[in-house]
């Protein structure tokens, strides 16, 4: 078609006035139909293969386009060579590989289980018996602990860690493997229905010991998950259940973790105790815990214990270190006489003479009666006879106090309780575990120097005739 145009017109509107003659006007332009050449006809009749297969194909291509663009963007970001050959076919994941990946995922999640189990360091034997159902179900700490240990057994690439986790799962707690304490309805539930307080206390002590080793395992698992080089860990042989009569337990890795935890919580205040007793009975972590306690932390820790509050992280570490120290200590052969003063009431206020009571917190006493008098004020002053106390005078920054520290919940028998002329309650206590040969029937009351009377150090206080009749010198 040949078109002759007048460039003056700016708007073109096509209309046909005579279809037969092929003549028409387009605005001010005149159009005339002419014969089409053979080459043009062949070009117009040429057919090409279709790029799509209808509407669905075009819609599919449009939907796929964004994903193709994302793939290209990722390839560019990662530096994929665009000149590479056709993409490789996707390799199917074998069942073995899938199982391995699932084990690795469970192993990584074990850290969360260990974190939940940390609260087991703070519960008592009574709580263990009363709350076992909640501790061993759902996300309870006992259930979480056992699940985490199982994940290490099946997922860790380090044989040492797998052996350690296996040994912990088999560790007897009150004669039943720890693994069974993570569920309800079995032997543990049956045991707890009639377990006496002594058994619950023993079970909790064994669990606390196991938790010390769990802390070391947790650190090793964290290192493996992070891809760090393998660290040495306590093997299953070192943490195997103790047979009857055995007493040696390898606690070095747990002690290291405890020491690092105390340093993290208390900084230089804890570090000052490092190396204080290089060849002594107690480890660095235990010395740190005892030192921190005597250096002011006793107030916060004992208050939380007496009010049955959950211990914070620092208090829990100190409590753990002191507990392991008392487990190591052995009673002295000689009976030790110490003194204790309190400004107000104490755990023995309501304990009658001849009866046994205990303080749920740690019990600080001194060889020096003046220290007890300074602490006593108008409250109470007690004279205590015992053999299980730890002498912390070489550890404490207040070494001149000559402190003898008794473990929490140490049973004491009240031999005597009376008020002096100033209204101060004066008591005589002895460890309930003392035998008859070392107790009060063998001369314990033959010369007790309980306190100072108003008349001075050399004048016996005679106002209470009961004390005089018992042979007690309250001077």
Swiss-Prot record:
Residues 260-436 form the TR mART core domain. CDD domains: ToxGAP. It comes from the Bacteria. The active site is at residues 340, 364, 403. The record marks 143 as: Arginine finger. It is found in: Secreted. Its main location: secreted. Its EC number is 2.4.2.-. One of its GO terms (molecular function) is nucleotidyltransferase activity. Residues 93-226 form the Bacterial Rho-GAP domain. The keyword Secreted applies. It is an enzyme of class 2 (transferase). One of its GO terms (cellular component) is extracellular region. Keywords: Glycosyltransferase, GTPase activation, Nucleotidyltransferase, Secreted, Toxin, Transferase, Virulence. Directly involved in the toxicity for RTG-2 (rainbow trout gonad) fish cells. Although the gene exists in strain ATCC 33658, it is not expressed. This is ADP-ribosyltransferase toxin AexT. The gene is aexT.
């Amino acid at each position: 078609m040949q078109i002759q145009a007048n460039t003056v017109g700016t708007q073109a509107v096509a209309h046909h006035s005579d279809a037969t003659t092929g003549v028409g006007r387009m605005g001010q332009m005149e159009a005339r139909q002419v014969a089409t050449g053979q080459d043009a006809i062949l070009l117009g009749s040429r057919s090409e293969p279709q790029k799509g297969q209808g509407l669905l194909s075009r819609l599919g291509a449009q939907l796929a386009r964004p994903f193709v663009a994302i793939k290209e963007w990722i390839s560019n970001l990662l530096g994929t060579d665009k000149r590479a050959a056709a993409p490789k076919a996707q390799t199917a994941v074998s069942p073995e590989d899938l199982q391995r990946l699932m084990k690795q995922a469970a192993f990584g999640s074990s850290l969360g289980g260990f974190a939940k189990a940390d609260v087991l360091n703070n519960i008592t034997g009574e709580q263990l018996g009363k709350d076992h159902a909640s501790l061993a179900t759902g996300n309870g700490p006992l259930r979480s602990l056992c699940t985490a240990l199982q994940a290490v057994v099946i997922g860790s690439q380090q044989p040492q860690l797998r052996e350690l986790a296996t040994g912990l799962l088999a560790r007897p707690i009150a004669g039943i493997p720890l693994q069974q304490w993570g569920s309800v309805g079995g032997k543990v539930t049956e045991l707890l229905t009639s377990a006496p307080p002594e058994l619950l206390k023993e079970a909790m002590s064994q669990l606390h010991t196991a938790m010390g080793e769990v802390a070391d395992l947790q650190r090793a698992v964290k290192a493996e998950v992070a891809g760090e080089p393998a660290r040495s860990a306590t093997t299953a042989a070192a943490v195997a259940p103790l047979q009857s009569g055995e007493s040696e337990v390898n606690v070095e890795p747990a002690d290291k973790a405890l020491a690092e935890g105390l340093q993290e919580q208390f900084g230089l205040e804890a570090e000052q105790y490092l190396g204080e007793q290089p060849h002594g009975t107690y480890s660095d972590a235990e010395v740190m815990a005892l030192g921190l306690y005597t250096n002011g932390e006793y107030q916060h820790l004992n208050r939380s214990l007496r009010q049955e509050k959950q211990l914070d992280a620092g208090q829990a570490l100190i409590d753990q270190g002191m507990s392991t120290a008392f487990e190591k200590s052995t009673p002295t052969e000689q009976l030790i006489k110490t003194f204790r003063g309190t400004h107000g009431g104490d755990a023995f206020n309501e304990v009658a003479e001849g009866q046994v009571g205990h303080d749920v917190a740690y019990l600080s006493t001194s060889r020096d009666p003046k220290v007890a008098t300074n602490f006593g004020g108008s409250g109470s002053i007690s004279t205590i006879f015992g053999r299980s106390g730890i002498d912390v005078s070489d550890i404490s920054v207040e070494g001149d106090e000559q402190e003898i520290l008794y473990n929490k919940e140490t049973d004491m028998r009240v031999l005597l309780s009376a008020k002096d002329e100033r209204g101060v309650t004066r008591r005589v206590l002895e460890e309930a575990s003392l035998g008859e040969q070392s107790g009060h029937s063998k001369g314990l009351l033959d010369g007790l120097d309980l306190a100072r009377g108003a008349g001075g150090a050399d004048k016996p206080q005679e106002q209470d005739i009961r004390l005089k009749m018992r042979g007690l010198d309250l001077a």
